[in-house]
């Protein structure tokens, strides 16, 4: 039987130390148990930690100091691209001189010479720029070259970054995109294939998706209220007709990046083959005339096929002397012709495949 005096007497020093020790152990076990359970419930926790580490590394690379970022801003910062690490310049883009000139005047100059235009609202850089046109014509290259030339921080935003299984998290991530861009300004938020993210809204849209789009557009509108804000949303698409009309209103500066014409194709070919082993008798104007309807990426792939023909010939050669020389012959006119024919057959086959899937009423 425990006497009442045992409860009323003061605890000895050893008993107090023992009690504190047990409480400490209990608290530590409880903390780590709860932490483990939270991590187990959220399977993306590990990815978030890795994204935070990557974001901190990128922030140091671009020289950003004393800027506090929230957890959501850290998730977006993982998609930052350092302009100094972009190995793309205007000299890497051929056949788009008019577009480049317009971009320099309307986007780059107001950012680089901000002090000249600070008293004019009309001459501020646009808050939205749309690059549209057929695939493979250099839209993404133009966006990167613009960011590098203007010295802007480049946020390569993937639509999947803004999706989260928890209700309300997508809106917080959308808000973090703009709050981060403002903290790092001048900055460009680039959305490739923007039509897949901000396409025409309909009543069949999921509630969470509709709310996230509305939040994104509302924050985008907020950029217009601060005329000194140097944040630009730049999008690229092959299907501008699928974009929501509210998005088109927010992107008043639009550039049509069309398939290259004859002189543009010749300039692109010169750029692609500039540092390659090409026979001096190759007539690039003739090649350009035979590649009507080819995009810039088509021309690059065609030149690669022509160069591979030379490599294949070297590999298949049975002459030991030729292997001893260890040289691959230059690309010749006939190699380019063969590559053109191969590319045309591939494009025709793809077109026929599309036609077979078209439903005829």
From Swiss-Prot:
Gene Ontology BP terms: extraction of mislocalized protein from mitochondrial outer membrane; learning; memory; negative regulation of synaptic transmission, glutamatergic; positive regulation of receptor internalization; regulation of postsynaptic neurotransmitter receptor internalization
GO MF, any single term: membrane protein dislocase activity
SUPFAM superfamilies with a match to the protein in the record: P-loop containing nucleoside triphosphate hydrolases
Enzyme class: translocase
Membrane protein topology class: Single-pass membrane protein
The protein's name: Outer mitochondrial transmembrane helix translocase
Segments traversing the membrane: 16-32
Its EC number(s): 7.4.2.-
Alphabetical keyword list: ATP-binding, Cell membrane, Disease variant, Membrane, Mitochondrion, Mitochondrion outer membrane, Nucleotide-binding, Peroxisome, Phosphoprotein, Postsynaptic cell membrane, Synapse, Translocase, Transmembrane, Transmembrane helix
Subcellular location: Mitochondrion outer membrane; Peroxisome membrane; Postsynaptic cell membrane
Native species: Homo sapiens (Human)
Disease per UniProt entry: Hyperekplexia 4: An autosomal recessive severe neurologic disorder apparent from birth. HKPX4 is characterized by little if any development, hypertonia, early-onset refractory seizures in some patients, and respiratory failure resulting in early death, mostly in the first months of life.
Binding site residues for ATP: 133-140
Record flagged with keyword Protein transport: no
Known function: Outer mitochondrial translocase required to remove mislocalized tail-anchored transmembrane proteins on mitochondria. Specifically recognizes and binds tail-anchored transmembrane proteins: acts as a dislocase that mediates the ATP-dependent extraction of mistargeted tail-anchored transmembrane proteins from the mitochondrion outer membrane. Also plays a critical role in regulating the surface expression of AMPA receptors (AMPAR), thereby regulating synaptic plasticity and learning and memory.
GO cellular component, one term: mitochondrion
């Amino acid at each position: 039987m425990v006497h009442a005096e045992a409860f009323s007497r003061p605890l000895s020093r050893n008993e107090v130390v023992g009690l504190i020790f047990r409480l400490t152990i209990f608290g530590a076990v409880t903390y780590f148990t709860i932490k483990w359970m939270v991590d187990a419930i959220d399977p993306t926790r590990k990815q978030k930690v890795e994204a935070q580490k990557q974001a901190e590394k990128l922030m140091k690379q671009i020289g950003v100091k004393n800027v506090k970022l929230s957890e959501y801003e850290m998730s977006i910062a993982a998609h930052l691209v350092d302009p100094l690490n972009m190995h793309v310049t205007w000299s890497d883009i051929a056949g788009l001189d008019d577009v480049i000139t317009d971009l320099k005047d309307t986007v780059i100059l107001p950012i680089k010479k901000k002090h000249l235009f600070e008293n004019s609202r009309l001459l501020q850089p646009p808050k939205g720029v749309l690059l549209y046109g057929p695939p493979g014509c250099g839209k993404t290259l133009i966006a990167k070259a613009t960011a590098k030339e203007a010295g802007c921080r480049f946020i390569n935003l993937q639509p999947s970054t803004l999706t989260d299984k928890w209700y309300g998290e997508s809106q917080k991530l959308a808000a973090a995109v703009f709050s981060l861009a403002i903290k790092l300004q001048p900055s460009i938020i680039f959305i490739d294939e923007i039509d897949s993210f901000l396409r025409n809204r309909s009543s069949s849209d999921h509630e969470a998706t509709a709310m996230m789009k509305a939040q994104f557009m509302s924050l985008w509108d907020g950029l217009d209220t601060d005329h000194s804000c140097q944040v630009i949303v730049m999008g690229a698409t092959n299907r501008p007709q699928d974009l929501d009309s509210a998005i088109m209103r927010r992107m008043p500066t639009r550039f049509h990046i069309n398939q290259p014409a004859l002189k543009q194709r010749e300039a692109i070919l010169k750029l692609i083959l500039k540092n390659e082993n090409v026979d001096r008798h190759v007539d690039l104007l003739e090649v350009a005339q035979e590649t009507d309807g080819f995009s810039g990426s088509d021309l690059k792939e065609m030149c690669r096929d022509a160069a591979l023909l030379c490599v294949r010939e070297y590999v298949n050669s049975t002459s030991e002397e030729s292997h001893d020389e260890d040289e691959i012959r230059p690309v010749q006119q006939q190699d380019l012709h063969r590559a053109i024919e191969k590319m045309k057959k591939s494009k025709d086959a793809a077109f026929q495949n599309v036609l077979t899937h078209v439903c005829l009423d």
